[in-house]
Amino acid sequence: MIDRYKHQQLRIGSVSPQQISAWATKILPNGEIVGEVTKPYTFHYKTNKPEKMDYFVKNFGPIKSGICACGNYRVIGDEKEDPKFCEQCGVEFVDSRIRRYQMGYIKLACPVTHVWYLKRLPSYIANLLDKPLKELEGLVYCDFSFARPITKKPTFLRLRGLFEYEIQSWKYSIPLFFTTQGFDTFRNREISTGAGAIREQLADLDLRIIIENSLVEWEELGEEGHTGNEWEDRKVGRRKDFLVRRVELAKHFIRTNIEPEWMVLCLLPVLPPELRPIIQIDGGKLMSSDINELYRRVIYRNNTLTDLLTTSRSTPGELVMCQEKLVQEAVDTLLDNGIRGQPMRDGHNKVYKSFSDVIEGKEGRFRETLLGKRVDYSGRSVIVVGPSLSLHRCGLPREIAIELFQTFVIRGLIRQHLASNIGVAKSKIREKEPIVWEILQEVMQGHPVLLNRAPTLHRLGIQAFQPVLVEGRAICLHPLVCKGFNADFDGDQMAVHVPLSLEAQVEARLLMFSHMNLLSPAIGDPISVPTQDMLIGLYVLTSGNHRGICVNRYNPCNRRNYQNQKRSDNSHYKYTKEPFFSNSYDAIGAYRQKRINLDSPLWLRWRLDQRVIASRETPIEVHYESLGTFYEIYGHYLIVRSLKKQILFIYIRTTVGHIALYREIEEAIQGFSRAYSSGT
């Protein structure tokens, strides 16, 4: 069993037959070595108990803790109890949880290629051997034979490479000159077929020589350059890509200490029984996992092949080859049903679920049980936009918040002597008393939460936020953090988690808060940038007059867009005078009172220390007043001067939308300046 405290990662790869045997072999207290599964029986149809020496009991431990297959009971861990196993059925008196991790193995009568390495694209076996996949498939499934180049020995057949077994005349004429046993010896020495031929070729490979030869060939192809023939250039490009993949694959085998011949199986691991259970349903019927039926099929065919090879010496070679092909197909179906075409079905025309079907996909063992399993102190809901939230805050619905922080609220009620025990505190929470929400607010103030949106493809897929209570049942999120999550507000769901330990809370505050992750970890570009709805909002907010006062004064066609209203009695336009405001608060107040629109042009008094005057710009108009003051009107601003031509006031021509955007930017800059000054 994997110790979760000692092992922090899981790696899947090829292993040697010796390692498979070490995992599955177990020595009983009487010295008997068990682990190999030889019989295909499961449960007896009368007693509903496992058959002895099958792949359900003796090799894997008792079904119930301390109870053997005979029904005898022993106390687990008691030193006085003797013996430690049942002498009749051979079952050891141990905890039944051993059946979740105790493996077995099937000793195959012939080598069998692992279908993942042969049929999956790209084919690792084809890449290493540098041979077409179709030829290798014909060799594995006994459609072709391989003539062995035996060195330092005379060869009777002058054959090299692959040839079709069925069309050779030698198999009819040569046996006339040999005895049956002599012909079998000759054939086994010079002719090879099936997965054994693949295993021999893989075992003869030198990975370092493969890397050197592939690099040399790649350089030679690169020196040739373009031939001018598009077809030849594509062929060379595909060959170069293949050589790169072959080098990377060989380096991976060297780096992970994996031998290529391990892709051909000699021992087939048998899963622990609890991972392929047989359960009893109503009516006394048994329901079995599909993998049990597929294992049973492998054992039947393997035992038949063993009998043909050991007990019947006069068995024709064609029959042995046919049975080897059946064993190969049975193992293929067990590992990946349907990968070679038509999948295997049961009597009800239902496709059997193979090992690949059990582990792959959204409902597979990894994504559903190990990675996507539900955990405590977590929730899930739809996300909606929260434009009024700060960047580091998220809106948490009351219904979710009270469930996530319930234990903290109970502790707060008891500490403040508002509840005498846990039961009373839970009663107050169920009744939703006002004091509960007050304590919940206090608890949430100092406790961050983690928001995660699947799939988590990079570290910004999970970030920390300071939660605030909101009405409704949806999680509110600031729109600027959506790009890191790759989220939008069209029905996306996000999970919320509560970090419990002090270390997790510190990590969330120092590393995972959203305002601490403003740059992309991959390329360093800003990731908290306006997108989608925010860009449209900014456009609407600043979509006032960009062409100055001349558009409104001298272009009658555009007057309707700038508060020029059409009279109902004639076809003339009435020009509404653009209002003047002394500060931005008055302008926003007028907008809230609906005296002006969001994009209505207005004149806003500007500070004298922030000049907007262009040195070479000349005024469009100059208005003089009776007291000697005069107005210089430019395209986007207006200057009020005294009699001595001193600047009294400066007005800029803007809109309420521009004012609101400027105030937000100004407040953000001031907040950053205060934070920087306090930090230094």
From Swiss-Prot:
Its cofactor is Mg(2+); Zn(2+). Keywords: Chloroplast, DNA-directed RNA polymerase, Magnesium, Metal-binding, Nucleotidyltransferase, Plastid, Transcription, Transferase, Zinc. GO terms for cellular component: chloroplast; DNA-directed RNA polymerase complex; mitochondrion. InterPro entries: DNA-dir_RpoC_beta_prime, RNA_pol_asu, RNA_pol_N, RNA_pol_Rpb1_1, RNA_pol_Rpb1_3_sf, RNA_pol_Rpb1_clamp_domain, RNApol_RpoC1. Zn(2+) binds at C68, C70, C86, C89. Transmembrane segments: none annotated. GO terms for molecular function: DNA binding; DNA-directed RNA polymerase activity; magnesium ion binding; zinc ion binding. One of its GO terms (biological process) is DNA-templated transcription. Its EC number is 2.7.7.6. It is found in: Plastid, Chloroplast. Belongs to the RNA polymerase beta' chain family. RpoC1 subfamily. DNA-dependent RNA polymerase catalyzes the transcription of DNA into RNA using the four ribonucleoside triphosphates as substrates. This is DNA-directed RNA polymerase subunit beta'. The lineage of its organism: Eukaryota, Viridiplantae, Streptophyta, Embryophyta, Tracheophyta. The gene is rpoC1.
